[in-house]
């Protein structure tokens, strides 16, 4: 994103359809690993209630957030709350607020839940529209000490609202960040059986929920959409002089930005409000 619980076993299917590997295709014949669920937020609660404060904190302000974003992030229920149906709703609105023309929300698990190696996933329905920028991402917990990009960043899912059929998974660290980050696009796939009515296709991503995931290993990171691996980065193939900070603790960030260099400003075609719905966020560790 930045440019400048219930214990149970989970068997992950490593589907290879749509596989696009950054740097090297490797391990396609590996056996699927078995993951144990360690932590999750299922966003169950009364409509209008705040996300669980044991897990989530708010980023508040209208500083542009290093990306020339246009919104003011708030902690108001109008911008972030549970919807009463088991979803977290993050809503971007067009309204004057604290000198900005838009409001939205950005929440994080900093100092509440931070982990290193493992599998992170979320089931999300993204919003759409010119200038709308939803994201599910991880930031290194040592950001206050070392800064960005040295802390590392994993963008599990970013979508440009004007192109809601395409999403990106990206790594940022020292030696590969901003415009030089290690990124890969994934285009929403419509199954042949859903090519015509009465089946309802799940594309673009704004039409329905999809599971976005990243598996962080000691020297390899894999990105998935709906169980399909489309992006893999290996530490041993990085250029000399780059860093690999991804074995250290990271925390989760969920947000909907408005405007910024990545997506551009909203225009007359953009409909407000725009809401990102999150069914759950989960973290797994490999079974021992």
Feature-to-residue mapping (PLM):
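GH16 jelly-roll
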Residues: 29-288
């Amino acid at each position: 994103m930045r440019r400048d619980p219930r214990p149970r076993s989970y068997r992950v299917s490593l589907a290879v359809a749509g596989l696009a590997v950054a740097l090297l295709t490797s391990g396609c014949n590996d056996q699927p690993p078995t993951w144990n669920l360690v932590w999750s937020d299922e966003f169950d609660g009364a409509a209008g209630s705040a996300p669980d404060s044991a897990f989530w904190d708010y980023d508040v302000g209208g500083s542009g957030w290093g990306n020339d974003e246009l919104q003011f992030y708030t902690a108001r229920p109008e911008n972030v709350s549970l919807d009463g149906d088991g979803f977290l709703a993050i809503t971007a609105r067009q309204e004057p607020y604290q000198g900005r023309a838009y409001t939205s929300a950005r929440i994080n698990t900093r100092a509440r839940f931070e982990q290193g190696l493992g599998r992170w996933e979320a089931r999300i329905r993204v919003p759409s529209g010119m200038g709308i920028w939803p994201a599910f991402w991880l930031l290194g917990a040592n950001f206050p000490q070392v800064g960005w990009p040295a802390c590392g960043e994993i963008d599990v899912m970013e979508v440009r609202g004007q192109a809601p059929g395409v999403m990106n998974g990206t790594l940022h660290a020292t030696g590969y960040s901003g415009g030089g980050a290690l990124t890969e696009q994934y285009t929403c796939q419509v199954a042949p059986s859903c090519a015509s009515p009465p089946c309802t296709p799940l594309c673009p991503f704004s039409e329905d929920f999809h599971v976005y995931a990243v598996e962080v290993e000691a020297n390899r990171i894999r990105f998935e959409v709906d169980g399909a691996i489309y992006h893999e980065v290996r530490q041993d193939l990085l250029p000399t002089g780059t860093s690999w900070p991804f074995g250290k603790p990271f925390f989760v960030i969920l947000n909907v930005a408005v405007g910024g260099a990545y997506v551009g400003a909203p225009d007359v075609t953009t409909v407000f409000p725009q809401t990102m719905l999150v069914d759950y966020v989960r973290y797994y560790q490999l079974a021992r």
